[in-house]
């Protein structure tokens, strides 16, 4: 906070001002100017096969390179969830033809700027602020992709124009977003600069055949070249026109799913200058405010002398909120938000808090150690290349005592199947998880050394544990 009165943002003066003292959450909408000026209110995932250009598309739209880690740059693949925010503008001059009247910029760009297109007048005005969740396309990173799907409102499905469609991960990702019930999808036919027109047309037919009968049927297919930034403004236009901003709940107690967490202190920092841990995630509902008391569940997990699991929720206070580089006084549901807390930074370093839920004290859901689920298995394994004409391997039924990987919200944890009948199963979780009855979960099984998506389920009920709270 750059001095001044409490509860008023003063960082980035070119953006809309947020004032906590006059905040009325009942009047906020996902398109309120003071919200979208500083933070994204809609999450769009990028999905598709490895090396089809997902990160490049995000970079073309937002100007942010989502690949942050050295080993990712060297191997040119996304390993962690990347993320980037972009503002989408529309020119207020009606004489300007579409799609040129749409433009995208980084999230700290002013909310209005004059046109630079010859022959037009007026200003580019902010219409949407979107957050991109850039998922890895590698088969071994399917769990990360599912964690990202937990916070998506819509998806961009990337298909490279110079390879046949569908590639293995393309179909696996499409199944994953079908489980997550994502209805809004744009298909981007990328690398169009590398193929002849006839090839592009032929692949267009392949894509149509591939998405028929899936959740992506009828989705617009946009030919683009992410590297040359060709047709990117068309993508912006479609994001504005085809993807509705989901209705948001601003009045409930806030709840945030953590998908990243880190320790922001440099080595050798003086003790007095240490900053608390930072949790990054997407708010599902409610509004978080600077200065608010918060609780993180399940918190610190340990075992007592008898080997029983114990959970100790972490209580803390929000010291700062930010969306990329923009300071916030309050954060609304939607895009990815960084929450600066007073939590011991060692608890947050290197994504240790992923899968936890952060929210108002006393308003978070129960902590489960066992789940009873109704489940549905896929008929065939997806994403595995099969020899020649052989059909993909059938998915075997769940067997008692086998270990599956369970994705709940943004948490991936192991689970042992303790009982199974018809379409109901009981799963004993390796790690306790904070969730609710009715939540969707994804199930994966170890097949030939890789975790493969085999089906999904819904939580019917479960065994909960009471959190232990210190009496101090």
Curated annotation (Swiss-Prot):
Transmembrane segments: none
Region feature G4, mapped onto this chain: 190-193
Protein's GO biological process: cytoplasmic translational initiation; formation of translation preinitiation complex; translational initiation
Taxonomy, superkingdom: Eukaryota
Outcome after substituting residue 259 to M: In MEHMO; impairs eIF2 complex function
Catalytic activity: GTP + H2O = GDP + phosphate + H(+)
Main location: cytoplasm
Annotated function: Member of the eIF2 complex that functions in the early steps of protein synthesis by forming a ternary complex with GTP and initiator tRNA. This complex binds to a 40S ribosomal subunit, followed by mRNA binding to form the 43S pre-initiation complex (43S PIC). Junction of the 60S ribosomal subunit to form the 80S initiation complex is preceded by hydrolysis of the GTP bound to eIF2 and release of an eIF2-GDP binary complex. In order for eIF2 to recycle and catalyze another round of initiation, the GDP bound to eIF2 must exchange with GTP by way of a reaction catalyzed by eIF-2B.
Residue numbers of Phosphoserine PTMs: 16
Subcellular location: Cytoplasm, Cytosol
Annotated spans, G5: 225-227
Keyword DNA-binding listed: no
Record-given protein name: Eukaryotic translation initiation factor 2 subunit 3
Lineage: Eukaryota, Metazoa, Chordata, Craniata, Vertebrata
GO cellular component: cytoplasm; cytosol; eukaryotic translation initiation factor 2 complex; extracellular exosome
Pfam families associated with the record: eIF2_C (PF09173), GTP_EFTU (PF00009), GTP_EFTU_D2 (PF03144)
Domain tr-type G: from-to ranges: 39-248
EC top class named in words: hydrolase
Disease the record associates with this protein: MEHMO syndrome: An X-linked recessive syndrome characterized by intellectual disability, epileptic seizures, hypogonadism and hypogenitalism, microcephaly, and obesity. Defects in EIF2S3 are the cause of hypopituitarism with glucose dysregulation.
Organism: Homo sapiens
Spans annotated as Interacts with CDC123: 457-469
InterPro entries in alphabetical order: EFTu-like_2, eIF2G, eIF2g_C, eIF2g_dom_2, eIF2g_GTP-bd, P-loop_NTPase, T_Tr_GTP-bd_dom, Transl_B-barrel_sf
């Amino acid at each position: 906070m750059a001095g001044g009165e409490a509860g008023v943002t003063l960082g980035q003066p070119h953006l809309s001002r947020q004032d906590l003292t006059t905040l009325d959450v009942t009047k906020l909408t996902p398109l309120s100017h003071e919200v979208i000026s500083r933070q994204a209110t809609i999450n769009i995932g990028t999905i598709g096969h490895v090396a089809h250009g997902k990160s490049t598309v995000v970079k073309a739209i937002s100007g942010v390179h989502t690949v942050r880690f050295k080993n990712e740059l060297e191997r040119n693949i996304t390993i962690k969830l990347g993320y980037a925010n972009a503002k989408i503008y529309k020119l207020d001059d009606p004489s300007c033809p579409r799609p040129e009247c749409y433009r995208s910029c980084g999230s700290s760009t002013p909310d209005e700027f004059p046109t630079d297109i010859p022959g037009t007048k007026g200003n580019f005005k902010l219409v949407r602020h979107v957050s991109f969740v850039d998922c890895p396309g590698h088969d071994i990173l399917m769990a990360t992709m599912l964690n990202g799907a937990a916070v998506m409102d819509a998806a961009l499905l990337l298909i490279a124009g110079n390879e046949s469609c569908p590639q293995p991960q393309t179909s696996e990702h499409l199944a994953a977003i079908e489980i997550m019930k994502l209805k809004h999808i744009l298909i981007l036919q990328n690398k169009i600069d590398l193929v002849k027109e006839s090839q592009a047309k032929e692949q267009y037919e392949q894509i149509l055949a591939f998405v028929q009968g899936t959740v992506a049927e009828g989705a617009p297919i946009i030919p683009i070249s992410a590297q040359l930034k060709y047709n990117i403004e068309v993508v912006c236009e479609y994001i504005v026109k085809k993807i509705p901003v989901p209705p948001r709940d601003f009045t409930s107690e806030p709840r945030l799913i953590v998908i990243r967490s880190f320790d922001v202190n440099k080595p050798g920092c003086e003790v007095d200058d240490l900053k608390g841990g930072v949790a990054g995630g997407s708010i599902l509902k409610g509004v978080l405010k600077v200065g608010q008391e918060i609780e993180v569940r399940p918190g610190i997990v340990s075992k007592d002398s008898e080997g029983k699991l114990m959970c100790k929720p972490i209580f803390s206070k929000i010291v700062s909120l930010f969306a990329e580089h923009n300071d916030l006084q309050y954060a609304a549901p939607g895009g990815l938000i960084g929450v600066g807390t007073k939590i011991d930074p060692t608890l947050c370093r290197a994504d240790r808090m992923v899968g936890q839920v952060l929210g108002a004290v006393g308003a978070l859901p129960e902590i489960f150690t066992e789940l009873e689920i109704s489940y549905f298995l896929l008929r065939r394994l997806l994403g595995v290349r099969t020899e020649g004409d052989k059909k993909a391997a059938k998915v075997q039924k769940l067997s008692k005592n086998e270990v599956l990987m369970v994705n709940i919200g943004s948490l991936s944890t192991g689970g042992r199947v303790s009982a199974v009948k018809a379409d109901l199963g009981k799963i004993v979780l390796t790690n306790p998880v904070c969730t609710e009855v009715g939540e969707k979960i994804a199930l994966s099984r170890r097949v030939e050394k890789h975790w493969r998506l085999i089906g999904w389920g819904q939580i019917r009920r479960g065994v909960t544990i009471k959190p232990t709270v210190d009496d101090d």
